[in-house]
């Protein structure tokens, strides 16, 4: 038996789902590098787009169930961690997705089966294929199984850049992304002081100073988060 065909069968057994639509599964596992332009090949890029949304829904649903008292701003960073490229690639390795992928010879030769971007994209495509083949329940079952260990990791208290934290908080509140504006620059060229204002729709802006624009922006973001009780 062809090694890749065997790997596809092993993958189905590991995730606990036998695909009715074999072409759909094959497309989910086919990277865009396949095909030389003359031969049209249906790759997994569109499924990857759909799967990103399916995965986001399942992750949001699971987080809301696990942390019913958490606020949106508290759930947002966990959600971002669960659907990140790093996490999706790690899940792909756990499911041994790499050997089942269909890649071009050149991509395979340079280690494409172990590349985070390829593995993460294929994971999203697989979630879309599960949704289309077996409905949301089939996708949910696989998600809860493969991502089970990721929930604790997503909740680890890793230090975050204040600007990133503010962006996640704003998204969790359903607000537009923060905007930054330099209000003033004082001091000599060798020791400048920047005054920066950060604004988020619906709340008062925060102002802070720093020795560089970046430092001032971080300080302003931190000030706004702390004032809103999210820092």
UniProtKB/Swiss-Prot annotation:
Residues 161-230 form the DRBM domain. GO terms for cellular component: cytoplasm. CDD domains: DSRM_RNAse_III_family (cd10845), RIBOc (cd00593). Residues 210-231 are annotated as: Disordered. Its EC number is 3.1.26.3. Residues 8-135 form the RNase III domain. Its cofactor is Mg(2+). Keywords: Cytoplasm, Endonuclease, Hydrolase, Magnesium, Metal-binding, mRNA processing, Nuclease, RNA-binding, rRNA processing, rRNA-binding, tRNA processing. The active site is at 52, 124. Mg(2+) binds at residues 48, 124. Residues 212-231 have a biased composition (Basic and acidic residues). GO terms for biological process: mRNA processing; regulation of gene expression; rRNA processing; tRNA processing. It is found in: Cytoplasm. InterPro entries: dsRBD_dom, RNase_III, RNase_III_dom, RNase_III_sf. It catalyses: Endonucleolytic cleavage to 5'-phosphomonoester. GO terms for molecular function: double-stranded RNA binding; metal ion binding; ribonuclease III activity; rRNA binding. Belongs to the ribonuclease III family. Homodimer. Digests double-stranded RNA. Involved in the processing of primary rRNA transcript to yield the immediate precursors to the large and small rRNAs (23S and 16S). Processes some mRNAs, and tRNAs when they are encoded in the rRNA operon. Processes pre-crRNA and tracrRNA of type II CRISPR loci if present in the organism. This is Ribonuclease 3.
